Amino acid sequence: TNYVFLKFDKEIYLSSNSAASIFVHCPIEIGIFLINGSDRESLDWITCDSLNSRFGLYGSPDTGTLCKYAEVTLATDMTDSIPYVEGVMKIILENNLDSGQTVSKVIFPITDNSLYYENSKVILDGLRVTLRKRAVVSIADVKSESVDTDWTKSPTWEDTTASTSMEMGLE
């Protein structure tokens, strides 16, 4: 699956029409590819934290999205990665609704986020999560945001997803 379900260790409360920026630890994986000229085929993905590797289902059992699931802690800044296990991702949370909201998770396609490394440290492209109304339903638009860094960018050979939204079962 290309989707990641990050469950925060602390709930983030956003009052109406407010925003917050947080840093979270995000699990990393190593991809093994077969490369023949311009043809690239992924053979396997190996998680760097095999003891905590889980999958979760976002949505109903019959139509939900299978996700790589991780319970993540808040990081202090972009350099707070756990060497060879977890990188750091910046998430900007915007609440454009007329009421306060609590955010405890985010689901997104990881193929939209590049990974950068320097020695044993890792950072990932960030996310912008916008809580808003679409007709009568509250949704969370999730978009990838490139990080500005001089760290080495890891090669990317997977397809990307244009945009995503999740219904507000935000809890």
Language-model features and meaning:
Residues T1-E171:
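Interface-prone segments of viral and bacterial extracellular assemblies
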